[in-house]
């Protein structure tokens, strides 16, 4: 805790913080490793079964308490112009955060195979970076942006009105009970599924929201071998506390 507090106070050089992060990650991975492959499979099956028994999201209000209900002025100070509250993309020719946000928004559209004229659901829309980008760049698309944060939805609605975007709707909803009207050509969810538990239940519902040729595009953090949830297991669990 002393080391983390010192780092957060800005007293440690970058190389030392990087070394500390690597050390913490190695410790985390050692705690997840299981040398017996059969035991590892049993553990994975038990993990999946536990997720299937619960709700889609355990505490949907918790992220709001942690950071989503922080005033947008804070995020305007630390994020790029688009307020993209998820990872950016840094090709070699990109040197600033605004351009990195644009690069990632464009890549998401390419991989989700967005076409003008589609009806699109942005599930877990954050501060509306992708929804607003779609509404601006694909004027024939009709976009529904969904967040469980009223503050975020109000912000997106105000920005859409300021930009005179008539093809963007915003809805505040709890993912446990959310049921949209109509069908969608694309459902896109960027860095929301990490916070969920019962993926199977939500994906089954999402299947009923798709048009006959519709597709779902998911972008989420994961490890190639280990399954885990975002938990705050202790005072030194930086990722659990802040993500």
Language model segments and positions:
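A short glycine-rich, Lys/Arg-flanked "PGG" loop and its adjoining helix->strand segment in the class I
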Residues: 200-215
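A short SAM/SAH-binding and catalytic strip from SAM-dependent methyltransferases
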Residues: 186-198
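Class I SAM-dependent methyltransferase SAM/SAH-binding core
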Residues: 136-176
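A short acidic, Gly/Pro-enriched loop at the edge of an enzyme's catalytic core
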Residues: 177-187
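Conserved class I S-adenosyl-L-methionine
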Residues: 116-126, 215-242
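Conserved SAM-binding loop of SAM-dependent methyltransferases across substrates and taxa
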Residues: 127-139
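Conserved Class I S-adenosyl-L-methionine-dependent methyltransferase catalytic core
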Residues: 29-111, 115
């Amino acid at each position: 805790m002393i080391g983390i507090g010192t780092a957060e106070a800005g007293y440690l050089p970058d190389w030392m913080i990087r070394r500390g992060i690597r050390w913490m990650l190695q410790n985390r991975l050692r705690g997840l490793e299981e040398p017996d492959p059969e035991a590892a499979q049993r553990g994975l099956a038990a993990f999946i079964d536990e997720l299937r028994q619960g709700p889609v999201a355990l505490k949907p209000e918790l992220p709001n308490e942690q950071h989503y209900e922080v005033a947008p002025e804070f995020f305007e100070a630390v994020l790029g112009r688009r307020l993209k509250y998820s990872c950016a993309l840094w090709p070699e020719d990109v040197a600033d955060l605004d351009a990195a946000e644009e690069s990632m928004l464009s890549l998401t559209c390419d991989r989700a195979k967005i076409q003008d004229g589609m009806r699109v659901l942005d599930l877990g829309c954050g501060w509306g970076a992708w929804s607003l980008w779609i509404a601006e760049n694909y004027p024939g698309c009709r976009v529904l942006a969904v967040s469980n944060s009223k503050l975020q939805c109000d912000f997106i609605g105000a920005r859409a009105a300021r930009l005179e975007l008539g093809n963007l709707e915003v809805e505040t909803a709890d993912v446990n009970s959310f049921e949209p009207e109509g069908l969608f050509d694309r459902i896109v969810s960027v860095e929301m599924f990490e916070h969920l538990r019962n993926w199977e239940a939500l994906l089954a519902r999402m299947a009923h929201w798709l048009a006959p040729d519709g597709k779902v595009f998911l972008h989420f953090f994961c490890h190639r071998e280990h399954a885990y949830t975002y938990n705050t297991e202790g005072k030194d669990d930086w990722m659990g506390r802040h993500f």
